[in-house]
């Protein structure tokens, strides 16, 4: 779970931006999409290929 503490002089907008960035970095939305929708075997294979190419770029 992502958690962001808001500083005294920090605005809500910047804290929200930091929270969204941490959620994206943790991969929470991609997990939700995967869990909520059924994937056919072909879609699973394609998503694994995409993930491998993303990891190779890093």
Curated annotation (Swiss-Prot):
Question: Which Gene Ontology cellular-component terms appear in the entry?
Answer: ribonucleoprotein complex; ribosome
Which PROSITE patterns does this UniProt record tie to the protein?
A: RIBOSOMAL_S21
Pfam families, A to Z:
Ribosomal_S21
Give the protein family: Belongs to the bacterial ribosomal protein bS21 family.
NCBIfam families, per the entry = S21p
Tell me which HAMAP family the record gives: Ribosomal_bS21
Task: Tell me what this protein is called.
Answer: Small ribosomal subunit protein bS21
Q: Which organism is it from?
A: Parasynechococcus marenigrum (strain WH8102)
Q: Supply the source organism's classification.
A: Bacteria, Bacillati, Cyanobacteriota, Cyanophyceae, Synechococcales
């Amino acid at each position: 779970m992502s958690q962001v503490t808001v500083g005294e002089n920090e605005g809500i907008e910047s804290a929200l931006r930091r929270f969204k960035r941490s959620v994206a970095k943790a991969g929470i939305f991609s997990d939700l999409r995967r869990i909520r929708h059924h994937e056919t075997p072909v879609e699973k294979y394609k998503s694994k290929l995409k993930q491998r190419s993303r990891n190779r770029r890093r």
